Amino acid sequence: VYCELYAGGKYDNNKGGMYEYSLGLNGLGACATQYSSEYMDVTVVRDKTQYTLHFEKGENIGGLQKSETRSVQTGTVQKWKPDTEVFTDINIPIEFFQDVLNKQAMVNAGLKFVLYNETETGMEMFEYYYENGIVDYVKETVGDDGFTTVETWEMEREGRDRADKEDYRMKMQVAFCFSNKVNMLEYYHNSSY
């Protein structure tokens, strides 16, 4: 996923498995970020094994490192610095990352995202988590101002964009309530299924 564009497992989404409903571009963002970074470090912990990769200017330095771990926690940590030879400005506002991770937490119910922001004065930590996904987000947004409960619709469908393309699967969840103080209509595409 980090070394080859479009190497992710989401493209074979019609045969079941991990990414059964995904239409996302897994492998594009991770690889493009790695290629355009001064450095990128990736650590993955799963199945009592820790995997690490180190990249510099698009090159994998040292290959895949694998070691046993006693950690019961699993997950992926990515740390990188955009390359100033690629980008004219690498000062990305923290609000951008906060917004993206909040939306990802919303569409990935029960999955916690943690953002560490290293500053000159120390380390800031932000956590994003919605146990019930968009339902909790709607409740949080409306607060006590809703005059109905949050209603949800969930559905799964198959579709095809063109006759010469294969069918794909889609999963959708809609959550809404009524409020005369909060007016919003938002759409989020989750490419993480």
Which residues make up each language-model segment?
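Short conserved segment of the HATPase_c
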Residues: 1-7
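Short, functionally important structural connectors and interaction interfaces within domains
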Residues: 3, 17-20, 179-180
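GHKL-type ATPase core
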Residues: 8-140
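GHKL/Histidine-kinase-like ATPase module
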Residues: 95, 102-104, 110-193
